[in-house]
Amino acid sequence: MPPIKRQPGGWVLPGYKYLGPFNPLENGEPVNKADRAAQAHDKSYSELIKSGKNPYLYFNKADEKFIDDLKDDWSLGGIIGSSFFKLKRAVAPALGNKERAQKRHFYFANSNKGAKKTKNNEPKPGTSKMSENEIQDQQPSDSMDGQRGGGGGATGSVGGGKGSGVGISTGGWVGGSYFTDSYVITKNTRQFLVKIQNNHQYKTELISPSTSQGKSQRCVSTPWSYFNFNQYSSHFSPQDWQRLTNEYKRFRPKGMHVKIYNLQIKQILSNGADTTYNNDLTAGVHIFCDGEHAYPNATHPWDEDVMPELPYQTWYLFQYGYIPVIHELAEMEDSNAVEKAICLQIPFFMLENSDHEVLRTGESTEFTFNFDCEWINNERAYIPPGLMFNPLVPTRRAQYIRRNNNPQTAESTSRIAPYAKPTSWMTGPGLLSAQRVGPATSDTGAWMVAVKPENASIDTGMSGIGSGFDPPQGSLAPTNLEYKIQWYQTPQGTNNNGNIISNQPLSMLRDQALFRGNQTTYNLCSDVWMFPNQIWDRYPITRENPIWCKKPRSDKHTTIDPFDGSLAMDHPPGTIFIKMAKIPVPSNNNADSYLNIYCTGQVSCEIVWEVERYATKNWRPERRHTTFGLGIGGADNLNPTYHVDKNGTYIQPTTWDMCFPVKTNINKVL
């Protein structure tokens, strides 16, 4: 999406007038050859936009001409501009010409040969490089660009009948990864299935506590489902992740392209014990992207609803729901005035309040996102900052020597030893002095974050209104399992095997400790607050970790450092919502009746990752992730991790090291 506040001169490179986005078409005289080429490129984009094309999402003739104009330009601006559009040529789909547009059809009929066909000028899927021969005239065709298969004009029975729906694919299956010195591109496709949720209704549901000491929760369940791409294992195969963490010192996502295509809407017909699934060529599915984050967040880290790791697994989309209020503060007990005031402020979000597409069988849609986030650093510190010195050189620093309650020992000052020089750098913050409140099965954390309005009636204690602040160790060494990140590899409702417990990363800027002296000994400081000169590294992620988390919208905040190592973003990718269209059917008593339908199709997700290869002066070999650290399992205990057994069961990792964490291999010089 374009920026809310566009700068008058655009976001151009320093010293340039046209080399960059969002600048006006007339911004003065170009400063050099690269700027002149950028001005011509902007004018070509303007013509494409006026003709109904979107040149920003697709590689086009103007981009190719810009690259050709700068092929002999070695200025800094020319190199940056040419490199950007070469990357776009490598990863973006091509904007088709008239001849190619005629090849794309949607068939809106069944076996009737005279049924009406409608055209769709969408580009071909994938990130194939556009050849010179394919970059031809890109003026708009006589038909409307991006036209969808429309209703009406179809003959024959709807919902299958004797014939079946016939159509041309709106995209192929994409997969695999590409590794370069500067970028890594991951491409994945999954078959998904979405069904009718909640009988097309919104409902307020009370989620009962799992224990007497737990919390109840109020939830608004909706008729919508959604796509969640927020996990590294959804995009990187184990081998790709091994290569990424072995060869690159840091990486971060830069752009994501999602395509939902080859939609097939089916009607479920039950006749006694028999069930028939017929094509429904007139039914629709609602799809839109919440790019402005106007609705409550759905992609919470560590949820099970992410895109499946295995390409052949069907992705059954989860139902969307959200929490409108802290239930304990809105129970209206004893006509409490505070709770009544809170209850009267409860919001109600209906997703139908947004514009969105309604697609039919055979149609497709696409979404593009840009990331603005920090790097994931993959280097480990082999020493702490306090040892960044030469131990062979004497120091001018001196220290005071206490007589230690011995009157015969005089107080004195002595020169500090060359190998024990003091440091200016302190450990990072963290909290380790608390424990979970029992019983053992309670839904609590060692620390609880709660909102407690004055005079509100609270029966369940802090566990009923708070959220577990977990794990709260910050950068400190965890003292027990209550301060370690743990997760299950198996889905909810199955046996709880595959429990992963994080280990120490062996990096000297993690798992730190601060000790306080008291004349005779040193005691551990369990709670360390924020001070100047604190130095620490981000929590080491694994392939099983989430990629991002959304920063809450607030007026103030301190240093943002999620405890699981995820990338905190102000604007992460917007949630893509989807639901089945409601098709009413007549009934004798005007009951709320509708067709029973579901939708399946393909969804592809392509992410461009910015990377930096490692370079080192270290003479010795370094540790790398290999297969020798994996396990053996399966039905007959014969199959290695990341393989399948005779029953088709996928052998998942059982330890933290098997998940190939970062910050365990490449040494960095502080």
Curated annotation (Swiss-Prot):
It catalyses: a 1,2-diacyl-sn-glycero-3-phosphocholine + H2O = a 1-acyl-sn-glycero-3-phosphocholine + a fatty acid + H(+). The gene is VP1. The N-terminus of Isoform Minor capsid protein VP1, VP1u, contains a phospholipase A2-like region. VP1u may play a role in the disruption of host tight junctions in the airway tract. It holds the Pfam family Phospholip_A2_4. GO terms for biological process: lipid catabolic process. GO terms for cellular component: host cell cytoplasm; host cell nucleus; T=1 icosahedral viral capsid. It comes from the Viruses. This is Minor capsid protein VP1. Residues 106-162 are annotated as: Disordered. Its EC number is 3.1.1.4. InterPro entries: Capsid/spike_ssDNA_virus, Parvovirus_coat, Phospholipase_A2-like, VP1/VP2. Belongs to the parvoviridae capsid protein family. Residues 147-162 have a biased composition (Gly residues). Disulfide bonds: none annotated. It is an enzyme of class 3 (hydrolase). A motif (Nuclear localization signal) lies at residues 613-624. Residues 11-66 are annotated as: Phospholipase A2-like. GO terms for molecular function: phospholipase A2 activity; structural molecule activity. Capsid proteins self-assembles to form an icosahedral capsid with a T=1 symmetry, about 26 nm in diameter, and consisting of 60 copies of three size variants of the capsid proteins, VP1, and VP3, which differ by the presence of an N-terminal extension in the minor protein VP1. The capsid has a channel at the 5-fold axis and there are densities extending the 5-fold axis into the interior of the capsid. The capsid encapsulates the genomic ssDNA. It comes from Human bocavirus 4 (HBoV4). Keywords: Capsid protein, Host cytoplasm, Host nucleus, Hydrolase, Lipid degradation, Lipid metabolism, T=1 icosahedral capsid protein, Virion.
